[in-house]
């Protein structure tokens, strides 16, 4: 699971270079922290964190095409509940305390979302936009 970010990083970096030639680009990436530290600056990276429970239980709440595709595949399985439980276990592993701490202590700008029932999307976007110098 954890090596897939390393394997795909070269492709992601090449694509980012290509699409960012004449414009600013913001992406959700799986480029590993050690690679980001080598190729980027503090003001070009923002780490977004949330409690493990939020990242696991609310993973499919967003309308991202990739997430909805996965949900559709899981829903089509004969043993849907077991498959969903297994998938959530994998998410919990990926979003473990150890990995959370690695990102929290990465040295990059970090935004921590709280699972308090309040919609903070606009506030989070504003913080990130200010960090990237896109707004005052």
Segments predicted by a language model, with ranges:
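Generic surface-pattern signal
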Residues: 3, 21, 64, 75, ...
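Alpha-helix-centered segments that form part of catalytic cores
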Residues: 3-13, 81-104
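Functionally constrained cores in energy, signaling, and assembly domains
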Residues: 12-15, 50, 55, 95, ...
């Amino acid at each position: 699971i954890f090596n897939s970010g390393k394997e795909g990083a070269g492709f992601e970096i090449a694509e980012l270079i290509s699409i960012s030639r004449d414009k600013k680009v913001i992406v959700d990436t799986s480029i590993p922290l050690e690679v980001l530290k080598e190729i980027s600056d503090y003001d070009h990276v923002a780490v977004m964190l949330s409690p493990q429970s939020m990242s696991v239980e609310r993973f499919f709440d967003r309308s991202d095409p990739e997430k909805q595709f996965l949900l559709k595949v899981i829903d089509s399985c004969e043993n849907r509940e077991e498959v969903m439980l297994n998938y959530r276990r994998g998410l919990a592993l990926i979003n473990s305390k150890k990995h959370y701490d690695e990102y929290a202590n990465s040295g990059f700008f970090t935004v921590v979302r709280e699972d308090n029932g309040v919609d903070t999307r606009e506030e989070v976007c504003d913080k990130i936009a200010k960090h990237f110098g896109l707004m005052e």
